[in-house]
Amino acid sequence: LVVSYDWALGGGNLNINLAGNYTETKITKFNFPEKVLASHSQDEFFGPDQINIIETLSPKTKASLGLNYKINKFNFLVRNTYFGEVIRDGFPFGSVQKFAPKVVTDLSVGYDLTKKINFTVGANNLFDVFPDLQVYENSYFGVFKYAPVQMGTTGNYFFGRLNYNF
């Protein structure tokens, strides 16, 4: 669901964008040929780890609220994105782990150098939000501090961008 509203405000234009979704994924049936299952286990092709990736490793809920204000040659963006809880089962070793919901904030400021060229600076994941730490046994024995769930594992990054509109 996406709702967007434009509002003339203070000589500029404020765009308010609200988006959200709820997704529930459940595998209900496998359709392997009988000849294959006669000599192989279903888990060899599609085991508990693959089922977990599809059913629980993506958040069921995700929502975003973005505010984009444009006035004269400037534009300002602030966006908060909510990522819901996810569950990792730890297969083939480890344990079940729930990862708490997180909110990530993006911020940018842009300036129109010409009618066709815009320069923007900003930050994605401004407050350096990370997923919960993995329990030791799920981290491949300390190799991976974070699971690649919800919003990723790279933390914040800052950028400069030059856009040309054709």
PLM segments and residue spans:
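Residues embedded in well-ordered secondary-structure elements
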Residues: 7, 56, 98, 110, ...
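Generic long, charged, amphipathic alpha-helical segments
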Residues: 80-81, 89-104, 108
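Gram-negative outer-membrane beta-barrel transporters
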Residues: 1-90
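C-terminal beta-signal and adjacent terminal beta-strands/loops
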Residues: 24-27, 81-89, 111-166
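A short, compositionally biased micro-patch
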Residues: 70, 102, 112-114
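Outer-membrane beta-barrel architecture
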Residues: 2-4, 66-68, 77, 108-112, ...
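Extracellular loop and loop/strand-boundary signature of outer-membrane beta-barrel proteins
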Residues: 48-53, 91-97, 145-150
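Residues that define the transmembrane beta-barrel architecture of outer-membrane proteins
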Residues: 1, 59-63, 101-105, 154-158
